A protein has these predicted regions:
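Basic, short loop/linker segments at the boundary and entry of helix-turn-helix/winged-helix-like folds
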Residues: 23-68, 72
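Helix-centered, glycine/charged polyanion-binding patches within enzymatic domains
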Residues: 387-457
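Charged, often Cys/His-bearing segments associated with DNA-binding zinc-finger transcription factors
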Residues: 1-36, 481-522
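Active-site- or DNA-interface-adjacent structural scaffold in DNA-acting proteins
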Residues: 97-319
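Electropositive, glycine- and tryptophan-enriched low-complexity nucleic-acid-binding patches
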Residues: 321, 329-375
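Secondary-structure capping and boundary motifs in well-ordered enzyme cores
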Residues: 37, 54-61, 72, 102-105, ...
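Acidic, metal-coordinating catalytic cores used for nucleic-acid/nucleotide bond scission
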Residues: 53-58, 88, 384-392, 411-412
Length: 522
């Protein structure tokens, strides 16, 4: 059963609490609650829920509000639930009808929410926020123009689209070959201990874990490590890991043989089967075992070929989907996380593509321009992007749609130099591309885009998309404030004009020189 309390049933005056003072309507969470299109957002989220099976869901407004609170305040899952249970304004914002001390839900529910909400759902939420922000602007400044018949002529291009790519860094230990092999060796030793207990054998395989640990500590304490020392240490760790993997294979064969003879119970649960299919470890350990084998083969290949490159390189045992993304930045040449292609229009940002592998962002240009047309009903007038986007094929595609670009032309430079006006105009338009860079900086510095803490690939993508959704809400707040200031100014201006007209009419009535007799009128 899907639970949702409509927005028109929740008012600030009806919110009950044991405190003597009324809640302030000027609170930032009260103002934000009045701006958000709750019903439309809830309709998108409800499509991912089942109406026929499963237990009762948490109120959808609570789910949406908790996601906003989490990323707007930069809290973890437990901290978000604790903050909602302690703050009366946050409880009103999340849709509760009265103040309560108990936690609204368990923090682990956030994981299920992130699994359920993907990039498509968050993109639909962003479209709703963009439409809300566009409705607050004056009619001349609005960009969305979808309400037109198909028989009419195509709408003229309008607006400016800024596109760029960045990497959302994953929260993992900085990977080095030595540390990665050391962690893989420790995990292999742990798996050996688990399997050995199930064999019932008296002799445990020799793994040299104490010697390997001692060598790792001595190596890690060295401030400066030469290439010869690093290669020698990696070679030793590879041999330790190879021995452990061989022991694991033998233990697995031994366990399988014993189970077929019915000399051992199947799995830890005590299920006896003649031909059991269960792997003798948990799914997590089984996955780690597979990852360790891939790491060994990759590191062995690089060790034998004396290189530092390999396809689909694994940099973390527990998050094997993370790949090194070369960026060529001065601060950090290589980043570890998901590469995203994003666009920005009038302060509103969207994510069109998320990938855990390196890709050329120029392939996303057509996707991002078409997404702009789907949202606003027309193509942009101007496209601002890096030079990597402006290849020959993309330039031709943009020219066919009358989309202007700002960038260095291909081929030989023009013989006719630009005049002062053209130079100023080009520089001004190029500076507008800084807006999308500013969005990336805002996300990384204020909302944790450079520290994605989810442990799965799908939940990490949801985490990234939710950050952009919250940044759009922050922009919506600013647009609403400007709209309120403009409305107040116009209201005051109209009242002043009315008073001036009334004063002028009164002056005309009281002036004897301006009065006319009936004979003069005739």
């Amino acid at each position: 059963m899907i639970k949702y309390t409509p927005a028109n049933q929740l008012t600030l005056a009806a919110f009950s609490h044991p405190f003597g003072r009324a809640l302030s309507p000027k609170n930032r969470w009260v103002k934000l609650a009045a701006l958000i299109p709750w019903d439309a957002l809830a309709g998108v989220y409800a499509k991912a829920l089942s109406t026929t099976s499963g237990r009762d869901s948490i109120d959808i407004r609570m789910v949406i509000g908790a996601l906003i609170v989490k990323h707007k305040l930069g809290l973890d899952d437990r901290g978000t639930v604790a903050m909602i249970s302690e703050n009366i304004y946050l409880q009103y914002f999340c849709g509760l009808q009265s103040f309560q001390v108990a936690e609204p839900f368990h923090p682990t529910v956030f994981v299920d929410i992130r699994k359920r909400m993907g990039g498509e759902q968050f993109d639909m939420w962003n479209e709703l926020i963009i439409e809300k922000a566009d409705s607050l602007k004056p009619k001349k400044e609005r960009n969305i123009n979808k309400d037109r018949d198909s028989d009419e002529k195509p709408t003229a291009n309008k607006g400016t689209l800024k596109i760029d790519a960045t990497v959302a860094d994953q929260k993992i230990v900085f990977p080095t070959d030595a540390n990665l092999l050391h962690t893989a060796r420790k995990e292999s030793e742990r798996i050996i201990d688990i399997l050995y207990k199930q064999t019932g054998s008296k002799t445990k395989p020799r793994d040299y874990r104490r010697v390997a640990r001692k060598e790792y500590v001595a190596f890690s304490k060295k401030k400066r490590k030469s290439k010869k020392e690093m290669r020698k240490f990696i070679g030793k760790q590879l041999r330790y890991l190879k021995r452990n993997l061989s022991h694991i294979e033998k233990l697995l064969d031994q366990i399988a043989t014993l189970k077929k003879r019915q000399e051992l119970p199947g799995m830890i649960l005590g299920i006896k089967e003649k031909h059991p299919h269960q792997f003798p470890t948990s799914k997590r350990d089984q996955k780690i075992y597979w990852v360790i084998q891939h790491i060994y083969h990759q590191q062995k290949y690089m060790y034998d070929t004396n290189t530092h490159r390999v396809a689909d390189r694994i940099v973390n045992i527990y998050q094997p989907y993370v790949r090194p993304i070369p960026r060529g930045k001065d601060k950090q040449a290589t980043e570890f996380g998901a590469k995203i292609s994003a666009s920005e229009v009038d302060g509103m940002a969207r994510v069109e593509h998320i990938s855990w592998d390196q890709f050329n962002e120029s392939v996303d240009l057509k996707l991002q321009v078409n997404a702009f047309k789907d949202t606003y009903g027309h193509y942009p007038t101007l496209l601002l992007a890096d030079q990597i986007y402006l290849n020959r094929g993309n330039r031709k595609w943009l020219t066919e749609r009358n989309i202007r670009i700002v960038g260095k032309s291909l081929g030989r430079p023009s013989k006719q130099p630009r005049n002062a006006y053209q130079k100023r105009k080009r520089k001004k338009e190029q500076n507008q591309r800084n807006h999308i860079e500013g969005k990336f900086g805002q996300g990384k510095n204020a909302y944790g885009l450079s520290n994605i803490q989810a442990r799965r690939s799908d939940t990490s993508e949801s985490w990234i998309a939710c950050i952009f959704f919250v940044m759009n809400l922050v922009k919506l707040e600013k647009i609403a404030e400007l709209h309120a200031i403009l409305c107040a100014f116009l209201k005051k201006l109209i009242s002043l004009n009315v008073k001036m007209v009334q004063a002028h009419l009164q002056l005309l009535d009281n002036s004897p020189k301006l009065k006319m007799t009936d004979s003069q009128i005739v």
